[in-house]
């Protein structure tokens, strides 16, 4: 079948962009291929891994399961639109300061899902953070630092002074051997 | 990369227009609500669509109307429904069942109508094109044989919609719209015991609304829902249990126990319900009734976990769900 072409004006990171694309392409494909916004990652493409998470009208959604032709009039935000001017988003600061990424492939999706959580709930409990990130898979970190970084980002966003705990950065001190 | 196949997209702005397009296009057209089931199925080429009709701009399918009964628009997202005050206060087990579907980022897209129509699932079907081609496909899509039961004339794919067993237990009804008119049927009558032809609705009908009767709310029924799965964060169930009990003077006067993710349709465990009726809700009566669920559950080797184990643990989880409904234990799991 000859692909139908859609022409739509999409609002991405506050900018209105008129783009033409095949009507069966997902938001993920149009963000990466037509708009050059490759911060949003391609993962399972079936809604199972969460690495393509973006915000649509402030809600975290899977861009691999949204048709780009359907998002006209919706406010799309990707990881490229998370910082304000030259200021990193508090979550970007806490993730960088703590080193809450290893390969980094899941990080954009996790930042977006976590930013939607903090916008709705500035002081989430550990359980609430875990629940909000239930659809975001990370195969490297074991999640510990990600959870700490979301809590750190929440603290920074509340204007609190937050530093990564030394044991989170360097591990716990070795036990001192007993004297013989 | 898994791209969608090319299709024509139609974006009607009223239910009548959507119905008219669907009846004009015929069965080669597919209707999409949230897309969380249809898009993966199209990407893996499990399903085909020459035309896709999006319901996103159909205003009649949105909204929750709470009066005596509660009516839920088919396009309401799962995320909105799991938090909707009318569900949380009056149908808490349904809110819980909906909240157990997949992950939060998916529930922000997925809809109630889409969940009710969820395609049946199977180890030999929910795979990509290359994988399925290597086994010459299966009878649910393009092949001739059921790999789960090779001598079987039918498909045994599993109905895993988490809302379905709870809606059946609550005696909910579903409103179907088509260009020929509308009809309302019990949710229980929407499902067929067949992995391929799993919905009793006609191809030209659109699920428009789900109605929850006033007599099924928390003031009238004790309810609970449980879902067994490998990862609590995201997975499809391998068993779900929906329970709704009516009691009078400490004795059960009516009971519905419906098992999900274990057969091609939400299966009522009638033996369990019959054993409960007339009995008090005690540890002993619940255990005795739950034992009878073993016969209602004959899991096949078509999803996660060993099928024998899934059968063995069915009475255990039926018992736990009944205890939660009876208030003997706090509800947990899901």
Residue ranges and their predicted role:
Chain A
Residues 1-180:
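Signature of N-terminal electron-transfer/Fe-S-associated modules in redox systems
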């Amino acid at each position: 079948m000859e692909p139908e072409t859609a022409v739509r004006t999409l609002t991405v990171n506050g900018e209105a962009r008129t783009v033409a694309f095949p009507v069966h392409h997902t938001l993920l494909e149009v963000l990466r291929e037509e708009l050059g916004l490759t911060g949003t990652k391609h993962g399972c493409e079936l809604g199972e891994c969460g690495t393509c998470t973006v915000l649509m009208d402030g809600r975290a959604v899977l861009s691999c399961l949204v048709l780009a032709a359907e998002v006209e009039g919706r406010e799309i935000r990707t990881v490229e639109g998370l910082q304000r001017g030259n200021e990193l988003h508090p979550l970007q600061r806490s993730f960088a300061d703590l080193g809450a990424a290893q390969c980094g492939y899941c990080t954009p999706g996790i930042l977006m899902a976590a930013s939607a959580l903090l916008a709705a709930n500035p002081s989430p409990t550990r359980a609430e953070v875990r629940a909000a990130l239930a659809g975001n898979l990370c195969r490297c970190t074991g999640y510990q630092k990600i959870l700490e970084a979301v809590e750190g980002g929440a603290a920074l966003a509340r204007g609190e002074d937050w530093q990564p705990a030394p044991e989170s950065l360097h591990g716990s001190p070795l036990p001192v051997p007993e004297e013989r | 990369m898994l791209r969608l196949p090319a299709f024509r997209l139609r974006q009607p702005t009223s239910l009548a227009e959507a119905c008219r397009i669907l009846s004009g296009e015929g069965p080669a057209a597919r209707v999409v609500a949230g897309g969380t089931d249809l898009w993966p199925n199209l990407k893996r080429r499990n399903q085909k669509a020459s035309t896709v009709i999006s319901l996103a701009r159909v205003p009649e399918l949105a909204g929750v109307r709470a009066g005596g009964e509660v009516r839920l628009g088919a396009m309401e997202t799962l995320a909105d429904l799991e938090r909707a005050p009318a569900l949380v206060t009056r149908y808490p087990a349904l809110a819980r069942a909906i909240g157990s579907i997949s992950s939060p980022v998916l529930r922000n897209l997925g809809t109630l109508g889409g969940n009710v129509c969820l395609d049946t699932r199977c180890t030999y079907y929910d795979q990509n094109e290359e994988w399925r081609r290597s086994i010459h496909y299966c009878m649910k899509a393009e092949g001739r044989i059921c790999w789960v039961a090779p001598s079987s004339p039918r498909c045994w794919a599993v109905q895993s919609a988490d809302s379905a067993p709870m809606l059946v237990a609550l005696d909910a009804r579903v409103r179907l719209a088509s260009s020929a008119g509308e009809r309302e049927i019990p949710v229980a009558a929407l499902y067929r015991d067949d992995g391929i032809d799993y919905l009793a609705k006609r191809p030209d009908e659109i699920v428009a609304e789900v109605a929850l009767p006033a007599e099924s709310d928390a003031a009238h029924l004790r309810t609970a829902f449980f879902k067994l799965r490998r990862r609590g964060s995201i997975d499809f169930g391998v068993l779900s249990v929906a329970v709704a009990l009516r009691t009078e003077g400490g004795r059960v006067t009516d009971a519905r126990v419906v098992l999900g993710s274990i057969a091609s349709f939400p299966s009522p465990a009638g033996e369990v319900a019959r054993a409960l009726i007339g009995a008090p809700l005690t540890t002993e009566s619940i255990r005795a009734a739950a034992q009878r669920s073993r016969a209602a559950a004959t899991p096949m080797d078509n999803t996660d976990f060993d099928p024998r184990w899934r059968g063995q643990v069915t009475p255990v989880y039926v018992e736990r769900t009944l205890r939660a409904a009876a208030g003997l234990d706090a509800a947990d799991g899901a």
